[in-house]
Design a protein with these regions (language model features):
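Multi-bladed beta-propeller domains
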Residues: 1-15, 43-59, 84-100, 124-146, ...
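Beta-strand-rich domains and repeat architectures in extracellular enzymes and scaffolds
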Residues: 7-41
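Blade-terminus and WD-like Trp-Asp/Gly-His loop motifs, strongest in beta-propeller folds
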Residues: 19-27, 62-71, 104-112, 116, ...
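Structural motif
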Residues: 36-41, 79-82, 119-123, 165-170, ...
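Active-site-proximal cap/loop segments of hydrolase catalytic domains
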Residues: 451-454, 467-662
Length: 662
């Protein structure tokens, strides 16, 4: 047996997604990423009868529990839709076809469900299978928001569509006579982007509205009969931009909404009475009540919310409840990261994802009723089966431009790989986003959890590994998130460079062998720092990073999000024609003539988050400059590569690169 984890061990780690309960609370389900895609994991709350559904073709893309029965829809990337019965452990194929479908959402009475087919809203009868497609504005090219459909109790269906290059919310009367001209009962208009519809008890539709280049956010309640709109929440920051995220959630009785807002400089739980429009901040303090970047508080009942918070430790997350009277109660304080809290229908049990220093993400449930809390592990981390325990991270701090920056260090001397060596190689890992945060242990998401797992492999090979939480990330307050506004590509890159210098200062690190790498914004930071701080790192590795900011901006505002919500100009300090020098300075391609060390690149051609043409920019520029580089492209691969074989090849090559550059 090997004395340290292998690449296969790294790739065997599974990543459960956010859990969801059946309507009766007898089952909960979550997708689990393994090998090349998601399977579906379903279990009872006691964990006595787990069931895994793996489709014969393709992988699970989404699932949706019926609102009335313990059945769920399961969609795959092979174009199939199943109705699954976890009690009988059966799956019935109810539709298939080459058309693109997505966003399955059950009606409140459980008799039908909506979805997009080739961009058009479709409603299907759950019993007869009869379908009706509505000839209304289409879904459009932009990425999904948290809610794409929302059903009212009287058969009105709200949905998101795209028109005039921005997102809108419209309402369909699904009971209108078949054959009539399909017209929207109500819709939003204007240049601002509207999304994430939900319904209030008084019949109004509530939704998120953003605009003015990321400077304005409002939560709107609209009367679909009169068109009258009320602003329930208003955020405006014309200098540095809005950095709040997460869709508002409606209370079970439909009279209140809750969301996480940084009104006092830190993300906290807020509730708004939909009738009086009175907003109440329920939590406060110099910490953030948010588990992951797009998280939002969840209703336990009409008077209580549950949420994740780093109030106990900036790099961890624990679960709490808060009443509308502002009384906060700890629910789960297990050391590590506890996120995605989902209360059971009876309010007595909480499902969530847990990860820590010794365990990769697991699905867990804890009792939240009065009495001694009990926790059950519904899935178990395969890290427990490794031949040696993982290296536990150490929180470290260093100064960057007068600011304290922190990160998490894996010291390989904790393992059996090395003893008191004084010439160990080192790696700085840069997360994406930038509104993300590396944690005190495994990250709950696959993207960063996989990187953390691989660095455990590197640490066992004798590499010192540092995860840097640079300016622009979450977990440290609004000012920290807004710190790169107007100076993108400068201040946060200084933080990355200082992380490299910190590693060089360690007496057991070889100062001539410190690498830097990252995915997405981490890839961008790698490309940028090699040109702006060419003497810090010995090699760079870029996965799906940005090289030309103006090229990216044009592509992103056509395919990812509307220009109304795009904060690219704000982050640059102006439009390209206003401050061309800033756009040039923020683009790594501008600085590639300064490269002094080799660069290795990996990118998938099917990337929906960073355009593949960015790799073309890198290759063309470095070829013309006669710089040392290498570039791999993976046909059809995603932003975070989906295939096990792709990651195996990438990780093996990264290891060879690090060894060769020592």
């Amino acid at each position: 047996m090997p004395l340290s984890p292998t690449i296969s061990d790294v790739l065997d780690v599974k990543y459960p997604g956010p859990p969801a309960w059946s309507a009766d609370g007898d089952f909960l389900a979550a997708t689990t990423y393994e090998d090349d895609g998601n399977s579906l994991f379903v279990t009872d709350p006691a964990g006595d009868s787990p069931w895994k559904f793996v489709p014969e073709e393709g992988h699970v893309t989404e699932f949706a529990w019926s609102t009335t029965t313990p059945e769920l829809l399961v969609a795959t990337d092979a174009g199939e839709l199943f109705l699954a019965d976890p009690d009988e452990r059966t799956t019935d194929l109810i539709r298939s076809g080459p058309e693109a479908t997505a966003s399955y959402t059950w009606s409140n009475d459980g008799t039908r469900f909506s979805f997009y087919r080739d961009g058009r809203p479709v409603v299907r009868d759950a019993t007869t299978g009869a379908e009706r497609s509505f000839d209304v504005p289409e879904r459009g090219p932009f990425l999904d928001e948290e809610r794409m459909f929302a059903w009212s109790d009287d058969a009105l269906l709200a949905y998101r569509f795209v028109e005039d290059d921005t997102t809108h919310v419209g309402v369909i009367d699904v009971n209108s006579a078949s054959g009539d001209t399909d017209e929207l009962v109500w819709r939003t208009r204007g240049e601002m982007a509207s999304s994430c519809p939900a319904w209030l008890a008084d019949g109004r539709v509530v939704f998120d509205r953003r605009g003015e280049g990321g400077r304005v956010r409002r939560t709107i309640a609209a009367d679909t009969e009169t068109g009258e709109e009320s602003v329930l929440v208003r955020e405006i920051d014309r200098e540095r931009g809005i950095v709040s995220s997460g869709a508002p959630t409606v209370s079970p009785d439909g009279t209140k909404i809750a969301l996480s807002l940084p009104m006092d400089g830190w993300d906290h739980v807020h509730v708004v009475d939909a009738e009086t429009e009175e907003r109440t901040q329920l939590t406060e303090g110099l910490f953030e009540d948010k588990g992951v970047a797009d998280a939002t508080p969840r209703w336990l009942d009409d008077e209580t919310l549950v949420f994740a918070s780093n109030r106990n430790d900036p790099g961890q997350r624990h679960l709490f409840s808060v009443s509308i009277d502002c009384e906060t109660t700890p629910l789960v304080e297990t050391p590590g990261t506890n996120v995605h809290p989902r209360p059971a229908p009876d309010g007595e049990t909480l499902a969530y994802v847990h990860a820590d220093r010794t365990r990769s993400p697991e699905l867990r449930v804890s009792s939240v009723a009065d009495g001694e809390p009990r926790t059950r592990r519904l899935t178990r981390s395969s890290v427990e089966e490794w031949p040696t325990p993982p290296v536990e991270p150490e929180r470290v701090e260093f100064e960057s431009a007068g600011r304290c920056i922190d990160g998490y260090l894996l010291d390989p001397r904790q393992s059996d790989a090395v003893d008191d060596a004084t010439d160990l190689p080192a790696v700085v890992c840069v997360h994406g986003g930038p509104m993300r945060q590396m944690r005190d242990g495994w990250h709950p998401s696959r993207a960063y959890g996989l990187f953390y797992t691989y660095h455990q492999y590197l640490a066992a090979k004798g590499y010192a590994c540092l995860f840097v939480n640079y300016r622009g990330g979450i977990g440290y307050g609004r000012e920290f998130r807004q710190a790169i506004a107007g100076s993108r590509g400068k201040d946060e890159i200084e933080d990355v460079a200082r992380a490299g210098e910190y590693l060089k200062s360690l007496d057991y690190v070889d100062a001539d062998s410190v690498a830097v790498w990252g995915l997405s914004y981490g890839g961008y930071a790698t490309l940028q720092v090699l040109g702006t701080h060419p003497d810090v790192f010995s090699v760079g590795i870029n996965l799906a990073g940005l090289a030309d900011m103006e090229l990216y901006r044009g592509w992103a505002e056509e395919t990812k999000y509307p220009a109304a919500v795009s904060a690219e100009a704000l982050r640059m300090g102006g439009e390209p024609w206003e401050v061309p020098e800033r756009w040039d300075e923020a683009s790594p391609a501008t600085h590639m003539a300064n490269y002094e060390v080799p660069l290795y690149n990996f990118h998938g051609t099917g990337d929906r988050y960073v355009n593949f043409e960015q790799l073309d920019v890198v290759v063309e520029a470095l070829t013309d400059l006669e710089k040392e580089f290498d570039a791999d492209h993976y046909p059809g691969e995603n932003h975070v590569f989906s295939k096990r074989a792709t990651w195996r090849r990438t990780f093996r090559k990264v290891e060879r690169v690090l060894e060769d550059e020592r």
